[in-house]
Amino acid sequence: MPARVHAILVVRPDGRTPAAHHLRRTLAALGEQTRRVDALTIVACGDDPGVAAVAAASGAESVITAPASTTFAAATAMATLRVRGDAVWLLAQDTAPEPEALARLVGALELGPSVAFVAPKLVRWDDRTSIVSLGVSMTGFGRTIELADDELDQGQHDAREDVLGSDVRGVLARTDAWRSLGGLDRSLSGADEGLDLGVRARLSGARVLLVPTALVAVAGDGVAGLPAPLTAPRRRRRAFASRTAQLHRRLVYASPVAVFFLWLAILPIAVWRTILQLVRKQPGFVMPEWQAALAALVRLPSVARARTRIRTSRAASWAQITPLRVSQRDLREQLDDDADSIDPARRGDLRFFTGGGAWLVLGAIVVSIAAFPALAAWTVLGGGGLQPLVAGVAQLWAEAAYGLRASGFDTIGPADPFAAVLAVVGTLWPFDPSRALVIVWLAALPLAALGGWFAATRVTDRSVLRFAGGALWALAPTFLAALTQGRPSAVLAHLLLPWLFYAGSVAQRSWVASGAASLLFAAVIACAPSLAPALVVALVGAIVLTVVLRRGRGVARLIWIAVPGALLAAPLVWRQLRTGNAWGLLADPGLVWAGPQVAADAAGRALLAAGIPTPDLVGWAGFLPGVPTWWVPLLAAPVALLAVIAPLTQRWAAGITLLVITALGLATAFGAVGISVAFAQSFPVALWPGTGLSLAWLGAVGGALAALDAGLAPRLAAVRTVAATVAMVGVLVLAVPALTSMARGTSLLTNGPASTLPAYVAAAGREDPEVGTIILTPQNEGGVSARVVWGGSQTLNGQATILSTRTAGIPSDDEVADLTANLVTSSAEDVVGDLAADGVSFVLLAPVAAPESDLSRAFRLSAETALNQRDGLDAVGDTAKGALWRVTQDVQPRASASASVHDLSRTIGLVQLGAVLVALLLAIPTAASRREARRAPRVVGPHWREGR
């Protein structure tokens, strides 16, 4: 007697397509079956008038209404009470069987008395030649493995029959087996339901068969099975359901002894899998991972019920399903096959060596050695805005954390993010961190050439233009000015900018680029806070364009770029805003130094427009004495002209974008030169405009390359090389005075000193890093500048903008002022005792910068007399750093920060470290990410994709 088939059709209107539309096709497909169903029960989840109307007209024996939150497993359990046939057919609104499907499923079920259920081949709703699912298995650790999915159906899997499980959609099960197994497990959250049913069927002694000739089209609404991963919310929903099901099955299938330990391991495994998700460039799955872990922790009653069901129906051992599992070897072969099936690469070879990149870097090394030969023998860089770094790596990172600052009595606050950059640099040479800066200076030209060359690969694939891009970037006037003047933050910002462009321009494509760009963005902002507004504007513009042109695909990756930088700067931002000093956030980090730079007038801004940040025309004013220098700014004109032409070529979109970057850089430079937010002693110091010019130079060079790449007809190809050569020669001539400044003795760089304090103090500082020195510097106007320094030297990483930019005094300032006034006058107070109580061991009367005025000379002599007459002060003598006195009383240790400060510092550090670690994990490339990258062109926005 033919088996009676009772179909259960579950409808839930939560798909992208209206449920009624899919339901009509499914009902029509049921009506076209060569072997009709004997009964149909529809379970309508939710209130949808369209679904209700279609269901009422379907001829179903009953229509059950259920809440919208009802799962497929719960809906089938409701309908099972009405099942009277020999077999149950599980369907959803988006499962449309082909006419022969049921007949073939019933035939297979009738021919196999030991078969509990049979499963069809699932194909795409709109393409029956594409396999969605054909059999499911799992690894030894319970990971679900599709035996065939997302493949072109060529009959390659039609010989497969015995499987461990299948997708639940379209399954035809014997009614008695269905009831004895207890139906679907409601705790699986909609994933692995067919696999779990198959495992339980196998353990009961039954078999599970595939019927590859029975085709069922599915749309992936997510009513039954997992939703199609078409949108980010759906992908997160799939990840949550899959992980929840895996954890649930792991606890259900485990031996009784192992269940407790597996339950304890859920959270540690979630931590490990979080790291793996970041390494796999899937940060969107981190939250579903933790949601699934927490759900598994509290669903122990569901685990107990599921284990009871298995125990009551089990008739076979677990060893019998072992052959049906997927081995690690088979899994590797399957992954290799998936990798081989990826679309062919669209990206050509980099051609770093064959395209001249290596020769460019080698030439830059030669030029650097010739320009700065003495640096090879130096251990510490001095001059300009340079100072030594602290001697130990631990101190380097301590100075980068929230807490006591290296200046002042009890100044507690956030460190500048630049201190973290210096800590990274210093860690590269841990035995002598100051030497790391020397190495950076010596390697700056080749590093700039390398960065410029790689940045050029995002604009053009022509070797000659890439070479030109690297050369122009390494010879940028603002970069050479920073090198010869000793501006470490500006040098590092210039070295980092091309890599930010390289990664940031493709950040919307991949998490690898986004992670790398986020670290570089944070580092650039740390080195050049004045660039923050321009870079934020550029980032917001990129986000808007991505929303408009890519329908939001990749927006999360672009948003992430700003996250690490924002977290690193957050403590400083909060401090400056709380003290009403928002402008102080733009201050150049490091030593506040009033070095030569153009004035905030028309002539100065004209030089800025030519890319020149110094009034001496980057050294040309003194290079040829008596020779007019009006023509020097014109040497950069070829680059500017080519950049302006770029929007008129086929690469108009790239040209406009790069011109906008140029405009943002120039606006930053123009604004910076007229803004003073930091003070060197009592004198305001304007922001260095060179970092803005570096950004402008990046856009101008990129625009010039884009113009030469696509702005010439094929018959004029030779003109491209000529134009690139002219631009390079012009900038090279402009760079000659800077490159020869050390040989001519005009460079501000010096060999050290290893300490900014006298050798006596430096020696004491090596023994005790907390030794205190109060430094008194007479002013030419007759006053005195005073500051307290801790350790054997003032250090570059010990500088803090919260101190150099403050516009109002703090309590420790008043204390320093009182001590200074009492020290330099014949006061009767025990000021030396106060110094000792505060932890100060030395008093240094520093010389005033030449020329010394009569007022400052008189003040210095008067102060020396007063200090010599003080009891408790022992004159060490005159040194190159000034006159030094030692406190002879018992000096108390410097007051330490409170426990609450340490707790706050630890919390801030952990949050910042977490953001950096996430960015690092995202930035590490994997084999899969490299394959994905090769599918996209290296050049961003090529003309054949942009149009005109």
Segments from the language model and where they lie:
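Conserved donor NDP-sugar-binding/catalytic core segment of glycosyltransferases
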Residues: 99-138
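Periplasmic/ER-lumenal interhelical loops and adjacent helix-loop junctions
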Residues: 402-405, 561-650, 755-756, 761-766, ...
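Extracytoplasmic
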Residues: 590, 732-948
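Active-site-adjacent helix/loop segment of glycosyltransferases
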Residues: 203-301
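Membrane-helix boundary/interfacial segments in multi-pass membrane proteins
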Residues: 382-395, 402-411, 479-491, 627-631, ...
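Short, acidic, metal-binding catalytic loop of nucleotide-sugar glycosyltransferases
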Residues: 28-37
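Membrane-embedded helix bundles of polyisoprenyl
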Residues: 215, 445-458, 464-548, 557-573, ...
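Active-site lumenal/periplasmic loops and adjacent helix-entry segments of GT-C-fold
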Residues: 373-506
